[in-house]
């Protein structure tokens, strides 16, 4: 089941909505209607461990904070589900370094 939460604004006052597709193991933000999308991919690598693998935002939408919303949604999911996270994605590593919230740090895979 997909879950979405409005976060920030995209274009012309359109809210950024991060959708979580648990079946496909991805978080997405639809851009420009349905034509483009930003995505954060993850995989389960253990019973309670997820690997946040890759974040991708189309070139035309970079620098607008979209990846930040994907990172926050993924880390909030890890915390809410009481999982451990392995951070393969360089952007997620950067996000955690810039936002060292205790609830995120407690859920990182050593």
From Swiss-Prot:
Source taxon at top rank: Eukaryota
Coiled coil location: none
SUPFAM superfamilies documented for this protein: Acyl-CoA N-acyltransferases (Nat) (SSF55729)
InterPro entries named in the record: Acyl_CoA_acyltransferase, Gcn5-rel_NAT, GNAT_YJDJ
N-acetyltransferase domain span: 19-109
PROSITE patterns on file: GNAT_YJDJ
PANTHER family linked: PROTEIN NATD1
Entry similarity comment: Belongs to the NATD1 family.
Protein name: Protein NATD1
Biological source species: Gallus gallus (Chicken)
